[in-house]
Swiss-Prot record:
Signal peptide limits: none
Source organism: Candida glabrata (strain ATCC 2001 / BCRC 20586 / JCM 3761 / NBRC 0622 / NRRL Y-65 / CBS 138)
Gene that specifies this protein: TUB4
UniProt subcellular location: Cytoplasm, Cytoskeleton, Microtubule organizing center, Spindle pole body
CDD domains documented for this protein: gamma_tubulin
Positions bound to GTP: 144-150
Function field: Tubulin is the major constituent of microtubules. The gamma chain is found at microtubule organizing centers (MTOC) such as the spindle poles or the centrosome, suggesting that it is involved in the minus-end nucleation of microtubule assembly.
Keywords assigned by UniProt, alphabetized: Cytoplasm, Cytoskeleton, GTP-binding, Microtubule, Nucleotide-binding
GO BP annotations, alphabetical order: cytoplasmic microtubule organization; microtubule nucleation by spindle pole body; mitotic spindle organization; positive regulation of cytoplasmic translation
Name of the protein in question: Tubulin gamma chain
GO MF term set: GTP binding; structural constituent of cytoskeleton
SMART domains for the chain: Tubulin (SM00864), Tubulin_C (SM00865)
Main location: cytoplasm
Recorded family membership: Belongs to the tubulin family.
Amino acid sequence: MTGEIITIQVGQCGNHVGKYFWNQLLKEHGIDKDGYSKYNDDLTHIREDDTNPFFKQITNNRYVPRAIMIDLEPAAVTDVQSSFNDLFNPRNTWVSSEGLGAGNSWSTGYDRGVQNQDRIMDIIDRELDSTDNFEGFQLLHSVAGGTGSGLGSSLLEALTDRYSKSFITTYSVFPSKQSEVVVGPYNTVLTLRRLCEDADASIIFDNNALLNLTARTFRDPNTSYEHTNQLISSALSSITNSLRFPSYMYNSMASIFSTLIPTPELHFLTPNFTPFTPDYIIGGQRYKKNTAYDVLLDLLDPFNSLVTQRSDMVTHFNVFSTVIGEVDQNHILRALPKMQQRLNMPSWSTSALNVNIGRRSPYLPPLESRENSVSGLMLSNTSAITSVFERSASAFDKLFYKGAFLNQFESGQLFQNGLDEFVESREVITRMMEEYSNAEQDTYLDDILNEDDIMIGGFDNEGDS
């Protein structure tokens, strides 16, 4: 049985993304918004899916998400709860009694998280008690506001400290260039340090790419973050497709991310998705019928990325793709050599291209014959991700070297003795970008491989004596 995954939604962005994620999972598992299955889940109806990773089954027909909602003000959590009919466990919600929010300050969010850590961890411990084969957490949050970044950072540290053997994945939303949060660059760099040090895998989204994709994807010209959240939820549901519609491969978080993360430092991943069909979004464009061959090659197009990528030559270290729908394996075999030709990969990267054949949910409405039959998601570990970090670091430097807005952090517990937290966080980002730059070289793993050769040689010598 696939292990259970607990989803933790932090802050306004995290909870709004979670709203669309759970709505998508309900559709794909044939569950109504009140948590009751649309089908009689008894011996006469054998499910083709596995609800256990993300839902607790309370009765034969009643399901509750393995979700925890956290915020410093009630609006976003209330919106999520009111969008469903008693779907979520009300005990799995923590909202600050003050209800004032973090005021877009990482420092305020972080300190509130530390102050209320025992209460929040009690909720998580209780949810863990309902699991039999717990695998890990997934954290939904933004990095530029106050709660998702600050409280999210303190929570990441606490999760790593208490559950060090559990896999922690973050789905982290980065701001657009036109962000209205003036201290956003500070918040982002402080959060990035925690993503570097405390997450096992971080899937990155940025609002620049999301807004551009939204304009091309939806027929409605008046798009908003409600539309971008649908794009994010499409990626989330597709990443977890092989866990919820399992086959003999890629049926755990570890089996997916082990194909993508060659070293612990290189754990930032870029999602691409195409096409956004009515299976995933409301009000999208219509697409012609396609094949897995078409989708796999289209996934390489930067225009289908949910992260703004630099246009110059980039290096891909590892790639994992899921194609969902009516898939002919011959189409995949045709596409793989062309993908290999188009991707610049270092010689040290072995088994760099991995493709999973996902299953379209049997609970979704049947497609018309003229509609496309395949959608695809690609997660890539690529040097292109550093462009997001370079933008964040550059914006941080412009503020920090002028001493702008630092007074908003002076009362924070981590800043009582000066600005070391800023300096150290910025240094962590520099080292991480250098690691990605080093990984572009064919010699990146030579030291490790040479050590392995020496060890093997040593064992051989012992055997000869």
